[in-house]
């Protein structure tokens, strides 16, 4: 007989503002058995994360109010538990993995110090005994050369590596229940498969229950025993995974299942001139040792990449985290040093100084993965979008800048009336539209898109892809699209490059590479997607 590990009973949660309370979770009931995985699925703003954070009472009160219902762990109430009881549960019996590891990891401490803190606090282990367990756990979550990485700080890891460290930190305590809030969003498909397999193995070993919050339905198919679908704070459908995918009953569930990226890239203009020509691009970071931090070697992270990109064309750059995708983008932007040839619209860029690059900067723009990090929270939307105009078109008046901001907000599907609001007042998809508007207002020829849809749920992701296609067709934009989501790459890209550990494994027309991959590594990626 299965044992009920966690029971959420008719939970309603609200946020108080002055005299009014806005209900964000409304009468939700969920149950997780020991050894079972329940997937919680829904768009951003549907109440998934608020429900999960309520389990350990991690939401600030005020403004949060628990309006009704209860949450029971092994039959004991968590909503009414003392702080001392909760301290014994948090991170020990119930562990949590958050979506954004840069927020969760301490930037001032090494990996070893942060991981040891978990074992010291929850299991009373001494440093010598803990080191072996830390190395074993890092190795299991796929951190290469774990012993050498213990002295690294979070900023020295790729996004995927940081997420793997977060997962290792949560699993060190061998919890009874794991709450995973979008834990594989930043990971490529091969590492994603490793992490899912690891979670399944640990679940079997520990008989661990798991609440898995995600917008990736392919993961839900592979991992979940049961699925609960949330919309506007309510649980609209709940069933066994196989049944729900085969015959969804609620219209919203049906909409979610039909939101996978699809379609073809926009037709290339004829003739399409070469906009970007890259030859033998190489990036190496110095390795420093000793008291004087002398350079003793170099870590080559991008090795001799060559490609051309035409006006109106999209080139997909695909690979595992740490494969050199984002580093390649930074090198093309001349934000880090590199070797090789970069020619943009006939102009060699490598030997230009900062002042010489300035007139070219507005023609090459970038949209980053996480708008939470790339948008200044202290500026309103008008100030964020017009910032580039202040640098590149300083003669414009404030009124002229505002008119251009209004026009570009219309173009990306944002209400210009919201231009005086701040980033925190928008959803994830809206924030990404703000980032696209900021790039678009300078009328670029090339936009480097670094995982622009990976943190978005499927329905919003489809909307952003449609927007990118329409903007490309209208303005003849070239895109360098960095991604680990092969479904998105197939729908958007004309050409594709597969990277592994900084080297090109395969490149060519997207349709050909997806239909008849020549390399085993490419076939593995396609099989996992």
Swiss-Prot record:
Annotated GO CC locations: ATP-binding cassette (ABC) transporter complex, substrate-binding subunit-containing; membrane; plasma membrane
Keyword Repeat: yes
Domain of life: Bacteria
NCBIfam families noted in UniProt: PRK10419.1, PRK11308.1, PRK15134.1
Residues bound to ATP 1: 42-49
Keywords: ATP-binding, Nucleotide-binding, Repeat, Transport
Domain spans labelled ABC transporter: 6-257, 287-526
InterPro entries recorded: AAA+_ATPase (IPR003593), ABC_transp_ATP-bind (IPR050319), ABC_transporter-like_ATP-bd (IPR003439), ABC_transporter-like_CS (IPR017871), Oligopep_ABC_C (IPR013563), P-loop_NTPase (IPR027417)
Entry keyword annotation includes S-adenosyl-L-methionine: no
SUPFAM superfamilies: P-loop containing nucleoside triphosphate hydrolases (SSF52540)
GO molecular function: ATP binding; ATP hydrolysis activity; ATPase-coupled transmembrane transporter activity; transmembrane transporter activity
Residues holding ATP 2: 319-326
Protein name per UniProt: Uncharacterized ABC transporter ATP-binding protein YejF
Family that this chain belongs to: Belongs to the ABC transporter superfamily.
A single GO BP: oligopeptide transmembrane transport
């Amino acid at each position: 007989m299965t044992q009920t590990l966690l029971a959420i009973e008719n939970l309603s949660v609200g946020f108080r503002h002055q005299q009014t309370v806005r209900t964000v979770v409304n009468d939700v009931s969920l149950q997780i058995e020991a050894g079972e995985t329940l997937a919680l699925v829904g768009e951003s703003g549907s109440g998934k994360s608020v429900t999960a954070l309520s389990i350990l009472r991690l939401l600030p009160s005020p403004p949060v109010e628990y309006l009704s219902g209860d949450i029971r762990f092994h039959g004991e109430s968590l909503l009414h538990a003392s702080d001392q009881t909760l301290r014994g549960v948090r991170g020990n019996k119930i562990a949590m993995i958050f979506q954004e590891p840069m927020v969760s990891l301490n930037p001032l401490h090494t990996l070893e110090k942060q991981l040891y803190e978990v074992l010291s606090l929850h299991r009373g282990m001494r440093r010598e005994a803990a080191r072996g367990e830390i190395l074993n756990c890092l190795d299991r979550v796929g951190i290469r050369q774990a012993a050498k990485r213990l002295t690294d700080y979070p900023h020295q890891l790729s996004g995927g590596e940081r997420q793997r460290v977060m997962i290792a930190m949560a699993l060190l305590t061998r919890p009874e229940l794991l709450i995973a809030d979008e834990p594989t969003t930043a990971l490529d498909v091969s590492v994603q498969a490793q992490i899912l397999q690891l979670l399944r193995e640990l679940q079997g070993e520990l008989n661990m229950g798991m609440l898995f919050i995600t917008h990736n339905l392919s993961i839900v198919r592979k991992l979940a025993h049961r699925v609960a679908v949330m919309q506007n704070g309510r649980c609209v459908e709940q069933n066994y995974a196989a049944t729900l995918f085969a015959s969804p009953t609620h219209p919203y569930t049906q909409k979610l299942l039909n939101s996978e990226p699809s379609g073809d890239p926009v037709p290339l203009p004829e003739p399409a001139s070469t906009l970007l020509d890259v030859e033998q691009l190489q990036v190496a970071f110095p390795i420093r040792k000793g008291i004087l931090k002398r350079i003793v070697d170099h870590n080559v992270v991008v090795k001799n990449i060559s490609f051309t990109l035409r006006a109106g064309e999209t080139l997909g750059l695909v690979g595992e985290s740490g494969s050199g995708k984002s580093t390649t983008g930074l090198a093309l932007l001349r934000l880090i040093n590199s070797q090789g040839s970069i020619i943009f619209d006939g102009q060699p860029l490598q030997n230009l100084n900062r002042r010489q690059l300035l007139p070219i900067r507005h023609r090459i723009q970038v949209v980053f993965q996480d708008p939470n990090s790339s948008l200044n929270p202290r500026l309103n939307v008008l100030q964020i979008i017009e910032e580039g105009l202040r640098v590149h078109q300083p003669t414009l008046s404030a009124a002229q800048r505002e008119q251009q901001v209004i026009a570009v907000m219309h173009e990306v599907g944002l209400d210009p009336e919201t231009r005086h609001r701040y980033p925190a007042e928008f959803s994830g998809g809206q924030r990404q539209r703000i980032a696209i508007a900021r790039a678009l207002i300078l009328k670029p020829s090339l936009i480097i898109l670094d995982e622009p849809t990976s943190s978005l749920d499927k329905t919003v992701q489809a909307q952003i892809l449609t927007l990118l296609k329409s903007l490309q067709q209208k303005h003849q934009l070239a895109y360098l699209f960095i991604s680990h989501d092969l479904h998105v790459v197939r729908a958007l890209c004309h050409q594709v490059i597969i990277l592994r550990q900084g080297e090109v494994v395969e490149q060519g027309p997207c349709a050909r590479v997806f239909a008849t991959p020549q390399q085993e590594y490419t076939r593995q990626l396609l099989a996992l997607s």
